[in-house]
């Protein structure tokens, strides 16, 4: 391998000739051979935005020439375009302030500018008015805000739109509800889907609430928050340039001491990501359980068959998209624990868990953005209800007895449900057997009872063709009260007359 000699304050070191990084990047490569997780590309892109904005602000303050600032800006634009991704090889597991990554960006910009005829020093020019202690926290917030606005929110809103279309496609389909994994009262399928939609939309509102804190930047605080070596008004200039480049309302944090030592804004924002992950897991579980089967499960939903599900069981198809969603959700929840603990370690004037916080936050954002789109395209858009199975389960449910509770009371309704379950009959048969509901009305009974119920104001609360009474009745319990017999013209004057008319026999 061809090398060239670079130097820093610790001396000379050999660097691969084909790469544009310098001595400090090379030392980090040799000293931190830990894991394989490189700094997220989102962090490098955020640094490219930040370095360009800082260069332009330094030019406005007279600390750089317009030509120097222009050279830095040109290289930063190429970095954001992804042209030099191979020049940023450092892993997450390095110094907790991210100093090596900051210097990696500085060195690459300086060397690429030198290739274009502009000699720049990584520290004196590219890092002017800056410290790793304020640039890495700022780059972290820039990357986090952009990942939320460009990845998570658009993907989640597309998923919510898919649920809305599913909701509108089946407005009148009734299904049985379930609580505690047991049968419950009925609801519309569209109502259940509206709940899924809101489970996606609510965390989006939480994320928008968290964004204003994420857009506050530590830039201008330099080493410990005092702003040493940074011109007055420099932080406002940098944020103004960033707003123009990204369209995001970045502002300087009013208290730089807080900005350098605390990552509470990151914890708050990731809490909203965790809420989205938890809700996605709930939705995915609902869908895969309701699609279980095809013959021995619930089978109330049909989901797309995307790939074979088993290497040994022919014809088996699994809810793979739902499983991918649940695994991504588990990872996000683990990331949340890491971010929370890292944020608690801001000892004195600087939090030194910045790279791991950045890695976990950006991984969560990337996972959620990708999984929302994958789940929408390969599962949600292809969901159809199994109307036949839904209807059969609806009519077979014992919890329909809840509708009778206002009429016959809670205990009587419970007795009906238990009898139907014990005897293996339908709920209707159990209610009839216990006498809480009569069969179809005959002769004058229908007309008399219709008037009686109408006077009580309860006509519309009964099923068509049936009448209910508050308690178990004797065999003659449907006879009208004595004082009302004369009004009921179609009802016989006594039980014996009723028997004679019914059977045609004498006494």
PLM regions with names:
Residues 1-452, 456:
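Conserved, well-structured ligand/cofactor-binding cores
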Residues 443, 449, 466-469, 491, ...:
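Aromatic (phenylalanine/tyrosine) cluster motif
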Residues 448, 495-498:
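Tryptophan (W) side chains
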Residues 453-478:
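Iron-sulfur-cluster electron-transfer modules
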Residues 459, 484-485:
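Polybasic, lysine-rich low-complexity intrinsically disordered segments
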Residues 479-481, 489-490:
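Short, low-complexity intrinsically disordered segments enriched in A/P/G/S/L with frequent Arg
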